């Protein structure tokens, strides 16, 4: 029996695990067991990332995503975003803890001068700060909400990203989306955006004894 072969026509999406598994949090459900110590996957150097972005451009890439680990731990993340935004719409998946006013200003400037759109997904796993921090680490909730407010104030319309299994219901159950929309409205976000994603039984969630330290 022959297996059908689909011809390669173009690259749809480029995912860049820019800081490998290096992260300042150690979330209990992290699919690749990222954390602050001894990352099993190292960060990518700046020139390597730029080279792959250019290769992706030649292959017709339509979207570029930066993930980790925590992308904002990379010392050249803004430079890398400037590079990717010349090629395709770009998205950063972040815990938000490293986004300061200065960083938010720089991101807004990048978005304003770029041909393509910049999107930021900020992870929050519960509307209750204590419940969220049991999952993500002490202080993570307040820092993530601050990041969302900073980005929103600059017109960047960040997406709050939550994991459905930790809410105890599916994405349509018990008003999960509305709970997060209400949370965003309560902190002054006038155009709330919420994305619910599944949690996979892999990485730290599949291990015993994994737990979140304080964010650095």
Regions found by a protein language model. Name each.
Residues 14-18, 64-66, 90-92, 118-122, ...:
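Hydrophobic faces of well-ordered beta-strands that scaffold small-molecule active sites
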Residues 7-47:
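Canonical Radical SAM [4Fe-4S] cluster-binding loop centered on the CxxxCxxC motif
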Residues 51-67:
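Short Fe-S-cluster ligation motifs
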């Amino acid at each position: 029996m022959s297996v059908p072969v689909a011809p390669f026509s173009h690259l749809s999406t480029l995912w860049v695990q820019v800081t490998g598994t290096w992260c300042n949090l150690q979330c209990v459900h992290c699919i690749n067991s990222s954390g602050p110590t001894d990352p099993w996957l190292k960060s990518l150097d700046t020139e390597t990332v730029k080279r792959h972005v250019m290769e992706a451009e030649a292959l017709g890439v339509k979207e570029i995503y930066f993930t980790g680990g925590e992308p904002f731990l990379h010392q050249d993340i803004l430079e890398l975003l400037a590079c990717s935004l010349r090629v395709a719409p770009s998205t950063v998946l972040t815990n938000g803890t490293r986004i300061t006013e200065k960083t938010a200003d720089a991101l807004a400037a990048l978005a304003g001068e770029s041909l393509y759109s910049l999107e930021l997904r900020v992870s929050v796993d519960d509307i209750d700060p204590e419940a969220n921090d049991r999952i993500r680490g002490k202080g993570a909730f307040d820092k993530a909400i601050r990041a969302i407010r900073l980005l929103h104030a600059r017109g960047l319309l960040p997406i709050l990203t939550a994991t459905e299994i930790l809410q105890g219901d599916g994405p349509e159950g018990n008003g999960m989306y509305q709970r997060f929309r209400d949370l965003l409205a309560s902190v002054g976000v006038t155009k709330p955006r919420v994305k619910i994603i599944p949690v996979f039984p892999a990485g730290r969630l599949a291990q015993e004894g994994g737990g979140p330290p304080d964010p650095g």
